[in-house]
């Protein structure tokens, strides 16, 4: 063992448990058996994910079911082949991670493919639902499947390639948590823990106990969700008045678990953002209805939603840009020193960071030894961008090469911003960027065909940003399981290749089952694609430019920009001068997320943070060893229940009850009267 790595004899060391296991070579990770299982599970997971997205619009996280299914299916396949007399390599956690990143990348491409959002928004079905006589140049109904395969492959590869140059910055230098990636790594490590490690066995036992409790709780909650806004997820904990402003505790095991592993400053920063937005700003804006804006629609950009989207995007982009420019400036100033450190390699890195524990040192050693040289993904991204700039306009004449050239120049910056936000909070705001892009490109083009062009541009952005941020989650998992970054990126490329073929085929399968008078995208269809109309409406509004936004929206954006610059400047000065104040200032990206996402989840995460603080106060050693295991169990249990819940929904099995809360007075009397009449009619 390398003496630089440190002492593995630590009670809570994960890598000490795996010390006797040799590191597998690349060919032992990227195996045909893993690829075969990845294809099978990708079909299942993508089918479920796209089905939910096309019916409900919002897809729960399917990473946890994919993690558990991938482990058990590949393990079963290996045992089956061994029983048939075939010699098999050992099933390692590294191969498990390669398999998992293939599936998750394929799933993320399916969810950002646009077959429930922007692509359906181009169709005549959705166009006629918004206008009686839409311009035929802003409609695109029948596109050959080959075009969609090429389009999806290009945008998927964009997401994978743009992510690679930021790997070391996000995971090693910034030490971002990427909560889902951390939890999945904890789960994979627990699955593959060698027998005999006391602490590891205790952590595994804790994960499965909490997992069972979380799964059971999710199943219990399901019975009370028979209608809209029903169940414990809509429990008005602090009263109906605050519930209307989305301040309530929704009993989510996932968010409580996230709160236990996210830093306290992140959790309370989210809550602070929720108070500013939903506690003060949005109630104030509601009083201006009829003066600053007219529409009551919760999704229209020329209503209150316009403030939400543009303020949150301004905060996130400004904060991300400042971090990006700080990184570039620091690297430029210290170029010579950084070059010198790079030449000295691993030994120099460890000398500069003597406080790293054994696990961190071991993981950094593997990461740096297998990293991809930055010129390789940069050259690949430029090549992919050049091909896309030529190929996409050739397939879709509504968008021009210079539109895509600008888009591909902007993508690296917004990718950095979005991935940074995901690393801090586990939230990808790629859909928000997509809405913003739709509006900007529609306003830029502002002629017939602008709606289709803006929807294509938003499709490129949402796929690139979301796939990139989730690929970084996977790389965080790979980092914590000693999986080679090269193998992880290979798995992501394979996932994109599978997904680009699979997604159009799954969509065509759904399309073939619809009734002639209720095509995909119509309100009468089994697949109404509820967000398709929203994306198209943004494009239609965007053709009118900034004047279509509600009054003073741009003023609020300027204020948000200035506040972010001032606060980030204070943080940078504090860090430079060694003041401690920066430790108590949350990231503006964190504060911005509740502006658009809502405030309910911030309360859950604060509860998780408070539980961890109380546990640490009572027994610090126990909290250090088991808190991440408890968090993993909470997240995985609720995450896995999404699969049976989705299957029940697919087979039209509805929950038997609806638990709903009403304010006293006329609402209760009306409900009592209805229930009494219902009982009378049945007798």
UniProtKB/Swiss-Prot annotation:
InterPro entries: OPT (IPR004813), YSL-like (IPR045035)
UniProt keywords, alphabetically: Membrane, Transmembrane, Transmembrane helix, Transport
Membrane topology classification: Multi-pass membrane protein
Top-rank lineage group of the source organism: Eukaryota
Pfam families, A to Z: OPT (PF03169)
Membrane-crossing segments per the record: 29-49, 58-78, 97-117, 142-162, 204-224, 265-285, 309-329, 372-392, 404-424, 448-468, 490-510, 553-573, 595-615, 628-648
GO cellular component, one term: membrane
Any one GO molecular-function label of the UniProt entry: oligopeptide transmembrane transporter activity
Annotated compartments: Membrane
Function noted in UniProt: May be involved in the transport of nicotianamine-chelated metals.
Family, as annotated: Belongs to the YSL (TC 2.A.67.2) family.
Protein name: Probable metal-nicotianamine transporter YSL3
Organism: Oryza sativa subsp. japonica
